């Protein structure tokens, strides 16, 4: 929580500095910085709307095709198409009609569609079964490729492909 709060600039460090891509984040405009950020927490949040709109929330001007491509890229498309109304399936606030893994896949699709420069994943696979974890892992691989990513995890499988690993 402390690391996420510092990286997200909910507060600044009392000593030292935090560099992202070699730049001290204290001197970056807060709105600009946060608009380039995607944060995925252990407890995903879905809005009371359709799956299509929940993914589109990542980038409001996205076309249906772009939303579907994002879902395909993180392995969410298959389960979405098995739902009674596909992408038009209504989900309750917090996504209670979906499993934890399905909610996380929808959130990954949203994050991929938003295309943030900086990604923070906090225990993104902690509450899911092994089979769903494999799907989510593939989604994570696509999500972190080519961007600065901070992955906070207890499972080695979640961080095995990271360039640098810090153990705290």
Q: What residue spans do the PLM features occupy?
A:
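Conserved ABC transporter NBD signature motif
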Residues: 16-23, 33
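ABC-family ATPase nucleotide-binding domain "signature/switch" substructure
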Residues: 2-8, 35-43, 51-54, 70-76, ...
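ABC-type ATPase nucleotide-binding domains, specifically the catalytic core motifs of the NBD
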Residues: 56-64, 78, 114
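Post-Walker A helix-loop "phosphate-sensing" segment adjacent to the P-loop in P-loop NTPases
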Residues: 12
């Amino acid at each position: 929580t402390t690391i996420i709060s510092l990286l997200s600039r909910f507060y600044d460090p009392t000593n030292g500095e935090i560099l992202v891509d070699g730049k001290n984040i204290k001197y970056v405009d807060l709105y600009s910085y946060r608009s380039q950020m995607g944060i995925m927490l252990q407890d995903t949040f879905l809005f009371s709307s359709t799956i299509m709109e929940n993914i589109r929330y990542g980038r409001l001007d996205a076309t249906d095709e772009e939303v579907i491509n994002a879902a395909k890229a993180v392995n969410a498309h298959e389960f979405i198409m098995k739902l009674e109304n596909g992408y038009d399936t209504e989900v309750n606030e917090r996504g209670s009609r979906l499993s934890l893994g399905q909610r996380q896949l929808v959130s990954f699709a949203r994050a991929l569609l938003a295309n943030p420069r900086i990604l923070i994943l906090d225990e993104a696979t902690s509450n899911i079964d092994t089979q769903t974890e494999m799907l989510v892992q593939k989604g994570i691989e696509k999500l972190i490729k080519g961007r600065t990513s901070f992955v906070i995890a207890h499972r080695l499988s979640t961080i095995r492909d990271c360039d640098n690993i810090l153990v705290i």
